[in-house]
Amino acid sequence: MTPDAEKQMGYIARVSNPNNQSNPAVAGLLGYCIKHGHWSVFEQAHMTVEIETTRGIAAQILRHRSFTFQEFSQRYANTNLLGEIPVPDLRSQDLKNRQNSNDDIPEEQTKRLQDQIARYFAEGIDLYNELIREGVAKECARFVLPLATPTRIYMTGSVRSWIHYIDLRSAHGTQKEHMDIVKEVRDIFKKEFPICTNALNWEYK
């Protein structure tokens, strides 16, 4: 996290007004910049967030190319270090919107299917462990693992990138599991950047 990030952005934003550059009052200035789309100043401060997710959702997150990432490597480390593979929630496909799913699968059906998934995952991790015991390289053994396998990401970006990422991925059409992550990230952002949060009208989101 950039120390005193909002104060730093305000200081840099006043680069052309050196007589007033050290003015600690930055709320109005940053609010003006957000309102009028002067985004470059928000590239002057950064935040890093640790994210625990699955390989399937990580692939969506890694598409945001304005960020830099460091991810747990299944080539170099045993995947068991991050815990058991979680059985996913099950939702039905929205027939009108391919980017949407509906939480309307009957409970009995969900339980039956999740039991099958749990058995499938158990067989997959047993095979992975056997391959490792047989001396197969981790970079090869990992190919038997499902997209639900846990992973850990460190995601670093400018305040500008975080604002647009949170706006985009909070919207309808983002997968629920990804939206859950964004809600947690937004809570962190609100704590660390209260002035920006107020200007963005995110206080009650």
Q: Model-found features: residue ranges?
A:
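Family-specific signature for flavin-dependent thymidylate synthase
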Residues: M1-K205
